[in-house]
Amino acid sequence: GNKAVRYGTTRNQVYSVEVVLPNGKIATFGSTLKKCSTGFCLDQLIIGSEGTLGIITKATLKLVPLSPFHVDVLAVFTKLSDAAEAVPKIVKAGINPTSVEFMDVSFVRSACEYCKLDLPHKEDGYYDIITIEAFNEAELDEKTEKLMKICEECHATDVVEADDRVWSVRRNCLESTRTYSKVGTSEDLVVPVTKIADCIKTLMEESKKYDFRPFCLAHAGDGNIHFQILKCDMSDEDWETQLEQFRAVAYPYVYSLGGRLSGEHGIGLKRLKYMEKYTDPVELEFMKTIKQAVDPNWIMNPGKVIEP
């Protein structure tokens, strides 16, 4: 989610998991110890397996206290390149942001219309939404000042405090696209944060070659990019053909940047054939070896992530 920049993903918040294994045995992997180097890290293996190695029946989670001071900032840019290039600068500025979200102008426009909200530059603005947390007011002021300076250096048109309206637009952006097309797909690409500007610019430019309608938003602070691609009035045949043509360009490019197919949604069924195609053969073979050893009958969540 959008706070992974500061707090990490769900896997970083799990102490241990209780699991029903394919052989029917019940085991607990992990512990509440602050550190443990006793054997394999099986809890993380289970967490990352999408249910293909066992069924999680219980999880012990960490609780992290909220910081007493925080501010949400909306930085508006009139150029995609400026908004995207600001992201790695914000992440590396030493302000430890809680979230850095990006919305392209198409999403800003559609979500504002859907929510019936009038936000700055809703017709021509690219949004970076940044949350900063601190333990005292002086620290918050210092971080905010640094953030404002970075945004101004990156040619932000407006930098204002974000209110609930901004987050309402962000939360409803995916739902808002249903007014344009009931059929679409969402990519879940992830690249190093230092490469996110190049990735967004390149793939948005590539998408102009096709008849589908592209939208882009990102959990930009951790390099996770969602391309929402809408079918609109395309024929079924053209839709399938052009979608595959786009992916044939996008996926190798993402991997060339050190990225991967999925940052948070997982492989499941949707990305299964691409997992086979783009994953390093040695890595893929290792996964299949683990699966075969733990679940020789392939009964756990069959047909997902990897195939026999």
Model region roles, listed by residue range:
Residues 15-35, 197-201, 234-245, 275-278:
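A short, flexible low-complexity segment enriched in Lys/Arg and Gly/Pro that occurs
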Residues 248, 255-267, 292, 296-300:
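Alpha-helix capping/hinge segments and adjacent helical runs
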Residues 106, 220-223, 261, 266-273:
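Small/polar glycine-rich anion-binding or flexible loop at a beta-alpha turn
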Residues 51, 227, 295:
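Conserved, mostly hydrophobic/aromatic
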Residues 25, 272-308:
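Activity-critical C-terminal alpha-helical subdomain
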Residues 65, 76-249, 253, 257:
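C-terminal substrate-recognition/cap domain of FAD-linked oxidoreductases
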Residues 1-101:
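FAD-binding subdomain of flavoenzyme oxidoreductases
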Residues 26-47, 205-208, 244-258, 288:
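Short, hydrophobic/aliphatic alpha-helical segments
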